[in-house]
Design a protein with these regions (language model features):
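N-terminal amphipathic/basic leader segments beginning at the initiator methionine
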Residues: 1-44
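Mg2+-dependent prenyl diphosphate-binding active-site environment of isoprenoid biosynthetic enzymes
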Residues: 31, 37-38, 44-198
């Protein structure tokens, strides 16, 4: 199975192709296309579970699309830093982190739709979705440790902490029209920026 970003690569690379904002992204995708395809296959395996509902919920969200930016960023960063070994499992750590956070966010925010489909909790219920999100986060931490060692595990734990604190801040300030720029920036730093930083 190809990554959703894989389809961007050919258009941005052939001679004479018009340059667009996505051209650099397409070039990046092409550099790690094999790793992206491997990570996509690996992600399906990592979402497997002896508990059928956990697997079904994980696949429901993962199969609904998404750009797979976290695996792409991981692969490009690793290659730029000179890493030459296999990357698929490490790439999946960031995507599992993202999937777990999306499952949790939709429950916390009462999301009705995700990626053009009913949000997972509308189909499977809040408790099962929250716990599946926990499984995704735990597997991300395990993968980080297995693939990159204790420093990566600590970094991923820091990111999960930042994201969770950002979500609490967002809840505390929900609906406030007097929200200052500093609080807004703190929320997005803890949520989106922390996730991308992994």
């Amino acid at each position: 199975m190809q990554s959703p970003l894989h389809r961007l690569a050919p258009a941005g690379l052939h001679a004479g192709a018009p340059r667009t904002l996505l051209s650099p992204l397409a070039g990046g995708v092409a550099l790690v296309a094999d790793e992206m395809a491997q990570a996509e296959r690996q992600l399906r395996e990592l979402l497997a579970s002896a508990v059928p509902a956990v697997q079904e919920i994980g696949h429901y969200l993962a199969d609904s699309g998404g750009k797979r930016l976290r695996p792409l960023i991981t692969a490009l960063g690793a290659r730029a830093a000179g890493h030459e070994g296999p990357l698929a499992r490490l790439m999946c750590a960031g995507e599992l982190l993202h999937l777990g956070s999306l499952l949790h966010d939709d429950v916390v925010d009462g999301g009705m739709e995700r990626r053009g489909r009913p949000a997972a909790q509308r189909i499977f219920g809040n408790p099962a979705v929250i716990l599946t999100g926990d499984v995704c986060l735990a597997r991300a931490v395990l993968l980080a440790g297995e693939e990159a060692g204790p420093v990566a595990t600590l970094e991923l734990a820091r990111v999960v902490t930042e994201m969770s604190e950002g979500e609490v801040l967002q809840l505390l300030h929900a609906g406030r029209m007097d929200l200052g720029l500093d609080v807004y920036m703190d929320i997005i730093d803890r949520k989106s920026a922390a996730l991308i930083s992994w």
